[in-house]
UniProtKB/Swiss-Prot annotation:
The gene is betI. InterPro entries: BetI_C, DNA-bd_HTH_TetR-type_CS, Homeodomain-like_sf, HTH-type_TetR-like_transc_reg, HTH_TetR, Tet_transcr_reg_TetR-rel_C_sf, Tscrpt_rep_BetI. Coiled coil: none annotated. This is HTH-type transcriptional regulator BetI. GO terms for molecular function: DNA-binding transcription factor activity; transcription cis-regulatory region binding. PROSITE patterns: HTH_TETR_1, HTH_TETR_2. Keywords: DNA-binding, Repressor, Transcription, Transcription regulation. Repressor involved in the biosynthesis of the osmoprotectant glycine betaine. It represses transcription of the choline transporter BetT and the genes of BetAB involved in the synthesis of glycine betaine. Residues 8-68 form the HTH tetR-type domain. HAMAP family: HTH_type_BetI. Residues 31-50 bind DNA. Pathway: Amine and polyamine biosynthesis; betaine biosynthesis via choline pathway [regulation]. Disulfide bonds: none annotated.
């Protein structure tokens, strides 16, 4: 009989091992055997919990998107009465949270984005994440701007966040958070009405 709570421990081990493998060798070269070895389990355990490599990759992407959602929501919940500007900066902060900009997370996101063009489940997860970001941004801009302007500003800020993130990911260097926050703050203040 399995130990109580072992499933969540094993799943976490396997997701962490998957992120490590993607970080070191890339998603396509990360094998079930390598991931199992990193996690200190047999390959059968992966099949037991995730069916196959695609199931494990999907669970890993769900985990990263869940961490992103939590990073944003934790910051927003800390500002229930915050101004639109502060709440927009909180959304930006969540997107640049360490869980999203570590080397392993950045490489995993890049691999998932590339794979999502060919795998319907990964595509769906990517679209949910993308729509959530845009919806959050537009909702906050909408507090201060007419609908069309809020949509345009939200789209622009989402593109800026993604662009800054992508440039850092492709550079192989850590994201320059002070610069990223400065640029996004400037964008936000340029699009919100002045008092």
């Amino acid at each position: 009989m399995p130990k109580l709570g072992m499933q969540s421990i094993r799943r976490r081990q396997l997701i962490d091992a998957t992120l490590e493998a993607i970080n070191e060798v890339g998603m396509h070269d990360a094998t079930i055997a390598q991931i199992a070895r990193r996690a200190g389990v047999s390959t059968g355990i992966i099949s037991h919990y995730f069916r196959d490599k695609n199931g494990l990759l999907e669970a890993t992407m769900r985990d990263i998107t869940s961490q992103l959602r939590d990073a944003v929501l934790n910051r927003l919940h800390a500002l229930p009465q915050g101004s639109a500007e502060r709440r927009l900066q909180a959304i930006v902060g969540g997107n640049f949270d360490e869980t999203q900009v570590s080397s392993a997370a950045m490489k995993a996101w890049l691999a998932f984005w590339a794979s999502s063009m060919h795998q319907p489940m990964l595509y769906r997860l990517q679209q949910v994440s993308s729509r959530r970001l845009l919806s959050n941004l537009v909702s906050e801009f909408r507090r201060e701007l007419p609908r069309q302007q809020a949509q345009e500003a939200g789209y622009g800020l989402a593109a800026l966040i993604d662009g800054l993130w992508l440039r850092a990911a492709l550079s192989g260097k850590p994201l320059d958070k002070p610069l990223a926050h400065s640029l996004t703050r400037h964008f936000i203040t340029q699009h919100l009405p002045t008092d």
